[in-house]
Regions:
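Peripheral, non-catalytic segments that deliver or gate enzyme domains
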Residues: 1-187
Length: 187
């Protein structure tokens, strides 16, 4: 591909349709490439085969210029998640129903000191690994009709060992716990 993206920083890529979303900053002034302060991270949509100058600005939040933002579109391209971080040790999550034209992001969480990691989406259900109310993590589930954190239900409660990760595969959940400095997986 001839596509080349510059000034993307603290970014991944999330595919949707014939392009992807990425996070970037404005190009710094000449001579300040390595000393410029990163502020007002923006999310753009890049269509494959087009120059970066044609990328569409998708999201920015000038009211919080030092925060980081990323977008994730689930595999079915039915939900889009916006993650906000940089003002604490955690993140906030917002969701948007892509099946509804012109839908807006709905805030799911509101504590930047806690962590919320999307594990999987199945139909309208969303599964999150979080330390909210569980310092050693727990797995919670919610759906698009009830995305606010107060509506989430605990699926796997906090245990005495740290729940490091959860993977969904072949209709099963694989729970990975840290115990005595070694990983232990349970199906």
């Amino acid at each position: 591909l001839d596509d080349h993206i510059v000034w993307a920083k603290f970014s991944g890529a999330s595919w949707q349709g014939d392009g992807f979303y990425y996070s970037a900053y404005d190009a710094p002034q000449k001579g300040r490439e390595f000393s410029n302060v990163n502020s007002i991270q923006k999310i753009y949509y890049h269509k494959i085969g087009t120059p970066q100058s044609q990328d569409v600005l998708f999201y920015q939040n000038p009211a919080n210029p030092m925060r980081f933002y990323s977008v994730y579109v689930n595999q079915e391209e039915t939900m889009m998640f916006l993650t906000e971080s940089g003002a604490g040790s955690g993140n906030n999550v917002y969701v948007r129903d892509l099946r509804q034209p012109n839908s807006q992001f709905i805030q799911m969480t509101s504590n930047l000191d806690l962590q919320y990691s999307l594990v999987e989406t199945i139909g309208d259900k969303m599964y999150f690994l979080t330390n909210d109310g569980a310092p050693k993590n727990r797995l919670m589930v919610t759906d698009l009709a009830h995305p606010g954190f107060n509506e989430w239900k605990t699926l796997v409660p906090e245990a005495k060992d740290m729940l490091e990760s959860v993977t969904f595969a072949d209709g099963k959940m694989i729970l990975n716990y840290m115990k005595d400095a070694s990983s232990h997986a349970f199906v």
